[in-house]
Regions:
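A recognition module on extended beta-rich or small alphabeta surfaces enriched in W/G with H and D/E
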Residues: 155-160, 166-219
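A surface-exposed partner-binding patch
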Residues: 1-172
């Protein structure tokens, strides 16, 4: 378990859940199975979750199945997070996602993902799919685009139904068309704070599966 990351980001206000009775709230069955002191059983349950939840992110799924060294649930105040550790040289790196809610703002396959796992971000850079609580409409998400060509495109799309859903942990920020999730043809958009060319009308899952897996490979 990555005590370094847990204490750095949550201080002392957290509890690793090693018993189902300590969860204290309703969770999907594939989450509940991770609440055990047996590491091999935790990993087995986590792999089952990955195969079910990351069905549209095959590259990310493959890396998680191959490289995850431990997975566990953490209670943080009234919330529950899933943490997945992996070894990178001489340090342990972790991703985290939050317990899902019954409803999602998204439809289709994106909504199905968020009803199973509320976001999936790198603990250190916060790069990855944001939890819904942090998702904001484009133009209200705190990101500013001053450099062309992203600045020009931003002026065109800021009045549309794009929402900031992916943080690259660097210069790029990812968006999704809310309407496209309702018809289950999710459309991704990537804007940059430098002069790189924006990526428009992208297949959402292909785009962010690729970005997530590249980030995991680089680490």
């Amino acid at each position: 378990m990555n005590d370094t990351y847990l204490s750095r980001f949550w201080g002392s206000d957290y509890q690793v859940i090693l018993n189902v009775a300590d969860i204290g709230r309703s969770l999907p069955p594939f989450w509940v199975d991770i609440a055990t002191a047996d590491q091999s059983r935790r990993l087995e349950a986590f792999r089952a979750l990955v195969r079910q939840v990351f069905i549209h992110m095959p590259e990310t799924s493959s890396l998680l199945l191959e490289r995850t060294t431990d997975a566990y649930l953490v209670k943080v105040r009234d919330d529950v997070a899933l943490v997945a550790d992996r070894q990178a040289d001489d340090q342990v790196l972790s991703y985290r996602g939050f317990a899902p809610t019954d409803k999602s703002m998204f439809g289709g396959s994106v909504g199905a993902f968020y009803k199973a796992l509320d976001g999936f971000c790198d603990f250190h850079s916060m790069g990855g799919l944001l939890p819904e609580r942090e998702i904001r409409p484009i133009g209200k998400d705190g990101n500013e685009y001053w450099t062309e060509p992203s600045s020009k495109l931003f002026e065109t799309v800021k009045s549309k139904d794009y929402f900031h859903i992916f943080n690259s942990g660097g210069k790029g920020q990812g968006y999704i068309s809310l309407h496209s999730t309702v018809v289950d043809d999710p459309e991704g958009l990537l804007l940059w704070v430098d002069d790189d060319e924006p990526m428009t009308n992208m297949d959402f899952w292909d785009l962010f599966d690729n970005w997530t897996s590249i980030a995991m490979e680089d680490n």
